[in-house]
């Protein structure tokens, strides 16, 4: 997992979406919690990519990682503790989240995002 996740994290930090997406399996599953309209489970690389495009469109490309506090890795998983920031119209939000990644050894096969304050996320996307 370390090599895959290290490459994924570097692509993410470099804003290199082609490199990041290449590390997703074709049947990757992305879980986004919440009650807002962008929450849900997105199955498949294209659905995951479409979700990211929708998020970026909604915030005018302003979403960014402003801090990576820690990364924990094992053979099959990585867990990242991050702070992100986004602006949507008159609203701005800086939020902490935990993202869990699962791999098959070659690709990221599943992700789960857990926001520290899910109510503020729901309100931001309302």
Q: Where would I find each of the regions flagged by the language model?
A:
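Short, aromatic-enriched amphipathic alpha-helices that serve as compact interaction elements
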Residues: 1-16, 23
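Hydrophobic pocket/interface hotspot
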Residues: 8, 20, 28, 44, ...
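Short beta-strand segments enriched in hydrophobic/aromatic residues
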Residues: 24-25, 84-86, 99, 115
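A short hydrophobic beta-strand element
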Residues: 74-84
């Amino acid at each position: 997992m370390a090599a895959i996740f290290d490459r994924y994290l570097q692509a993410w930090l470099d804003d290199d979406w082609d490199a990041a997406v290449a590390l997703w399996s074709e049947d990757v599953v992305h879980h986004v919690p919440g009650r807002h309209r962008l929450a849900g489970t997105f199955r498949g690389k294209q659905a995951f990519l479409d979700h990211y495009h929708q998020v970026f469109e909604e915030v005018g490309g302003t979403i960014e990682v402003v801090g990576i506090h820690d990364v924990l890795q094992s053979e099959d998983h990585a867990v990242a503790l991050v702070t992100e920031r986004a602006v949507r119209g008159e609203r701005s939000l800086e939020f902490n989240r935990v993202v869990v990644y699962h791999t098959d050894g070659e690709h990221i096969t599943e992700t789960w995002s857990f926001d520290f304050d899910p109510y503020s996320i729901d309100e931001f996307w309302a």
